Amino acid sequence: MTEQPTTANQMWGGRFAAGPDAIMEAINASIGFDQRLYAQDIRGSRAHAAMLAAQGIISTSDAEAIGEGLLTVLSEIEKGDFPFSTALEDIHMNVESRLKEIIGEPAGRLHTARSRNDQVATDFRLWVRDQCDAAIAGLDALIRAALSQAEKGADWVMPGFTHLQTAQPVTWGHHMMAYVEMFGRDLSRFRDARKRMNESPLGAAALAGTGFPIDREATARALGFERPMANSLDAVSDRDFALEYLSSAAICAVHLSRLAEELVIWSSAQFRFVTMSDRFSTGSSIMPQKKNPDAAELIRAKIGRILGAAVALFVVMKGLPLAYSKDMQEDKEQVFDASDNLMLALAAMTGMLTDLTANRERLEAAAGSGFSTATDLADWLVREAGLPFRDAHHATGALVAMAEQAGIDLPDLTLEQMQSVNPAITADVYGVLGVHNSVASRMSYGGTAPAQVRAQIARWKEKLEEKSA
């Protein structure tokens, strides 16, 4: 006769005549990944126990035993001595079971006025809040590295691109400051997300609250939350905080990927705009000459995992009725993986930018290619010859075609050639056709003129110092 599984190890087993099938245990268990929440779980449980004692719901001696026992559990986990069990499903039941082994009967009082629903919502929210802080710190370091690059090359001229074709001259500093702005918005998004998630679900119990006279304000304060969540159903159903974290991570990931792509292109022999540090490059097993931008390529690839995690959790959450459904167990792996990859990508990009050498001579040599000052010529025709911009655009296009056919650049056209297209052109036009004059003229707010770039660098330095003060 086949032996039936039992519910002996299950804290919810009282209502069941038989235990779960092995396949059920396998699909139900989350301890393989949610053990990462151990510190948050223990922190939440200690706050809950202290509150229960303060409210006279459990004795002070039981609360003290629970608090000390949980510290023992924490120590065992951090030393690698903790006996994690798949049969106990998750981090919450593993911790409580071990606590019972350590302190006995008082451990059974810990779960008074609490459900795993508000427990996991609290643990996970605490963990994601910590990850917002980590992302903010990582982005701060990355912004500083990009600012350093911008400061070095505030007046280094380089080609600006649209469609990966030469468009207009810009400066290296201006290009780097574009990423500072992007990463700055990312940092703000994580700060905003952190503010919204900084409310405590603890005390919502399963979904309806509890009849015990608990003090949710006290546990919220103890855990560093601003306030308890106002609706118990929402408190256990909500995963907006995880979705907001993933959304912020996904947008940041796109910015990292765009910069990684540019570094891969720019480091190629065909561009030679930048030289990667040996510390963030690898070689080939067969081609001795190779120096591959693997760190940038791996950042670009890992970004796909972050984007995938965001989509996956949105899909999990989109069809769930209130309140808790077991589907929500699938929230954590997505966030864990996205966080791991985001923090690695931020650190790698910061290291790459810190060590990166921009090749000024190559940048400046390329800046004038592709008739990059054609727009300056058209603007000159508007200002000096009084042409409507569309007519100036047409005349400039004709001059570009003339230069292209002759195999020369715009500044190499003779005045006679230029006047054959428009007689109003004078020798003064040559003053706007140089790349340095072109960038210096872009003095509009946010423009590429070195003075504007330096002003933006100073603004960002001040902004960062204000935030860190």
Curated annotation (Swiss-Prot):
MF (Gene Ontology): argininosuccinate lyase activity
Catalytic activity: 2-(N(omega)-L-arginino)succinate = fumarate + L-arginine
EC numbers, comma separated: 4.3.2.1
InterPro entries for the chain: Arg_succ_lyase_C, Argininosuccinate_lyase, Fumarase/histidase_N, Fumarate_lyase_CS, Fumarate_lyase_fam, Fumarate_lyase_N, L-Aspartase-like
Any one of the GO BP annotations: L-arginine biosynthetic process
Pathway recorded for this protein: Amino-acid biosynthesis; L-arginine biosynthesis; L-arginine from L-ornithine and carbamoyl phosphate: step 3/3
Top EC class of this enzyme: lyase
PROSITE patterns assigned to the protein according to its UniProt record, in alphabetical order: FUMARATE_LYASES
Family membership: Belongs to the lyase 1 family. Argininosuccinate lyase subfamily.
Stored PANTHER family: ARGININOSUCCINATE LYASE
Entries under NCBIfam families matching the protein: argH (TIGR00838)
HAMAP family cross-referenced by the UniProt entry: Arg_succ_lyase
Protein's name in the database: Argininosuccinate lyase
UniProt source species: Paracoccus denitrificans (strain Pd 1222)
